[in-house]
Amino acid sequence: MSEKFDVVVIGAGPGGYVAAIKSAKLGMKTAVIEERKVGGTCLNRGCIPAKAMIHASTLYREIKEADRFGISASDVTYDFEKILEYKEQTTGQLVQGVEQLLQANGVTRYYGKGTLFEGKKVKITGNEEQFVEAENVILASGSKPLILPIRGMDLPRVLTSDELFKLSEVPKSLVIIGGGVISVEFATVYSALGSKVTILEAMPRLVPNMDKEIAQNLKLILKKRGVESHTSAAVQGVHMEGDTCVCTFVEKEKEQTVEAEYVLCAVGRCPNTDGLFAEGAAPDMERGRVLVNDKFESSIPGVYAIGDLIFGAQLAHAASAQGIVVAEQLAGKEPSVNLDVVPGCVYTDPEIASAGITEDAAKEQGIKVKTGKFIMSANGKSLITKEERGFIKIVADEETDVILGAQMMCARATDMIGEFVTAIANKMTVAQLLKGMRAHPTYNEGIGEALEEAEGGAIHVVPKKKK
């Protein structure tokens, strides 16, 4: 006799485990099925380990540059084995924390692979096979690295992000195919640790989904740190010459090659649906993704999908928010999270963050806008820490004063973007957001200055000469 649950979640990544815990908190009998460590890609092979390595590598670079603060540090070195240990300890601690939260909230944890059968039955394939039944099933099996369909992608020195994390030594040189978030973050890490990094991006600019000015600044900053970037570069393939990877690409109609010890394929991710559906049990899908309605319900009543399995933002925090909303809906409650405003963050140095729409996007939609921009070189905290390169820009509706978007490239941008997410989600105006006093000296003062600039003039900005 199979056990019955109100909610069965397949996958315990940031979408799945959050959906499971929220469902349990709302009084539903809940189970979660996961064949690997809880936390999914984000916790084990993505966000957290990457940011740990960014922190370590940035700290190494800052110590080498400490002379500008009057600090002498000669013969500074790093121990990559210990950096990897620190990364593993960090992820391990968080994984253990998630396991404890599942247990503390009464979520039944099944170890194994979950496969959906007809009638909302789920087979768990682990040490032994068993079935569970569910009133509602939430599919949250996440994604896996996307591999380009070009020659050489199966070579042993051509890696995905999963495999790059497993390297025990820093590559002497690294070619990164793709110029998105994953690419520029790994470029930040390995260039700081001494690798010669080259980025090949097919689009006209790096981080193409971000503001154009941010992309231009990022390319210059990476170049200053020794990272070579080629945009509008179509990669043709990779071959080996001895132990060296040779990557062929076309840029401005000219075929070129670049050599490296390793090649990283970082062109995005695709849904992980391997073994997820038994024959005849799959819902309607398109290009490998589950099609859902505005309540995240698939074509099969009572079967929901969230996160990287569906179209939309492929981000850990988006998946978590969707998991919360689905659980709330199943409990008959109104959603507590506005899913329309998704912050985007890039953990380069300086950090990049955005929310809402850009000025160009607003104009394309026919919206008359006003903008406010503050250059962080005039911010006291930025000068103290010598992180003065960057800016904060806000976009607001010219007629209603409602904030539509914000783009930031500065220290702690990823920590500060939440203020704008809250403002945009609640349709706050520039005037309303200016009501709050900001502490001094903080990076956050830059937000106030950008808002003031949109209203007619920031205090710490030289006014434009009247014509």
Regions found by a protein language model. Name each.
Residues 2-5, 21-28, 33-170, 198, ...:
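Glycine-rich flavin
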Residues 2-13, 170-180:
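Beta1/beta-strand and adjacent pyrophosphate-binding region of the FAD-binding site
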Residues 8-15, 19, 24-36, 41, ...:
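Flexible, glycine-rich terminal cap/loop adjacent to redox cofactors
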Residues 8-10, 114, 132-142, 177, ...:
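Short hydrophobic core segments
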Residues 154-171, 257-331:
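FAD-site-proximal beta/loop scaffold in flavoenzymes
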Residues 16, 183-184:
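N-terminal Rossmann-fold NAD(P) dinucleotide-binding loop
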Residues 20, 24, 187, 191-192:
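Gly/Ala-rich phosphate-binding loop of Rossmann-like dinucleotide-binding domains
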